[in-house]
Amino acid sequence: MLMTRGVLDGEPKRWSCLCAYDGTEFAGWQKQPNGHAVQDKIEEALEKIFGSPVRTIGSGRTDAGVHAIGQVFHFDAPWMHPLQSLLQAMRTYFPTGISPLELKEETNDFHALLAARGKRYRYRLCLVWAMHEADRSVYSLKEKKVNLAAMQEAAKHFIGEHDFSAFSVSRGEDEKLESKARKVWKVEVLEEKEEVQVVVEGSGFLYKMV
C-alpha cells in the first residue's frame, strides 16, 4: 500500500524513531552491499510507505548478530496525517525482527548521531547447560566455572579514557588518522540468578571493541 499524494504533499519534516531489533539474521545496522543490514530493511520499508527513496541516519552502528533495544535513527519525509498513523504504517511495513517503538517530529537541526549521549552494551552469559532455546540473546557457558570476583576486579581497569586500539579491529586506510582513545564510563559484572551480565557504558566504542 503506497500513500496517496495528498498524504505526502508539503515540505519534508524531520522524524526521529526509536527502534528495537533482533540482530540474529542481520548484517549489523549499517547498510551493506548484500542489502541485508537493519538500515537496508528500514529504508526499503520507508520507500514502500513514501513511494520514493528515504535516507536514514542512525545514532550508532551495531555489528552482525547484535541486538538493540534503543537504537535511534532520523529521516526526512513529508507527512500530512497524524504522527500515529505514520508510526502504524512503519509497524506494518517493517520486517519481522525490527520494531519501531516511538516516533517524534524533530527540528531540522536534529541529528541522531550527533545527539547520541552514549552507548550501552549488555552481554548475558548463562551459567548452566540448559536455557530457553527461544532466548537467542543469551550465550551459554555450558557449566564452565566463572571467577566472578576476578572479572569484577578486571572490569575496573577499563573505566576511564584509554587507547583501546588493542581491543579493536581496523577497517582500513580511512582509520589511520582516527584517535583510538575512548572514554568508558562504567563496566559492571553482575550475577543474576543463573546468569552473569556484563554491562559496558561509554561515549562511543571502536569497531569490535566491546
List PLM regions with ranges:
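Structured-RNA-binding interfaces characteristic of tRNA pseudouridine synthases
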Residues: L2-M209
